[in-house]
């Protein structure tokens, strides 16, 4: 199992830093070393950047008026992610090997799970209790290649953003 901590990069940025392991705060994460990835979110797009060499691994662009579908390009391929349903906060995506995954979000829990097409839990995201700088902790249950990890990280960030917006709008 692999564990990652996700933190806001700063107070006035939409970027998220991804560190290995679970950390109490951003300072302890930074003391242990450089972030592995940075997820940048813009109004109509997202990027996953490997921090060690500033290489963009995955670029996503929202499609349509409602922004409920995203085209994702990276690793020499393109795929799509889309909202799991009209009134649902979860998202689905197809990886670069044509396997389907779904983020399942519970409105009564501070965590959500990523399942594969067979219903197996592949990853779990648990939101931080105090949501000042830490978004939460992502646990990836089994070894995955970097392409699938990139898709997991970006779609987890999309779901986190949607859940946050839903809470702020009272939905």
Stretches with model-predicted labels:
Residues 61-90:
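Helix-adjacent hinge/juxtasegments
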Residues 40-70:
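Acidic, aromatic-enriched beta-alpha/helix-loop junctions
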């Amino acid at each position: 199992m692999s564990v990652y901590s996700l933190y806001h990069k700063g107070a006035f940025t939409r970027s998220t830093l991804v560190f290995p392991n679970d950390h109490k705060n951003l300072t302890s994460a930074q003391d242990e070393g450089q972030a592995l990835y940075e997820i940048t979110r813009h109004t109509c797009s997202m990027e996953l950047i490997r921090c060690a060499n500033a290489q963009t691994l995955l670029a996503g662009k929202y499609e349509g008026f409602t922004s409920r579908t995203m085209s994702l390009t990276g690793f020499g391929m393109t795929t799509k992610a889309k909202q799991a349903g009209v009134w649902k906060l979860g998202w689905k995506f197809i990886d670069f090997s044509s396997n389907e995954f779904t983020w399942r979000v519970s409105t009564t829990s501070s965590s959500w799970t990523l399942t594969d097409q067979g219903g197996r839990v592949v990853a779990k995201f648990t939101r931080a209790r105090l949501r000042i700088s830490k978004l939460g902790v992502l646990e990836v249950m089994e070894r995955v290649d970097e392409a699938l990890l990139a898709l997991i990280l970006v779609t987890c960030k999309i779901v986190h953003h949607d859940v946050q917006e839903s809470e702020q709008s009272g939905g």
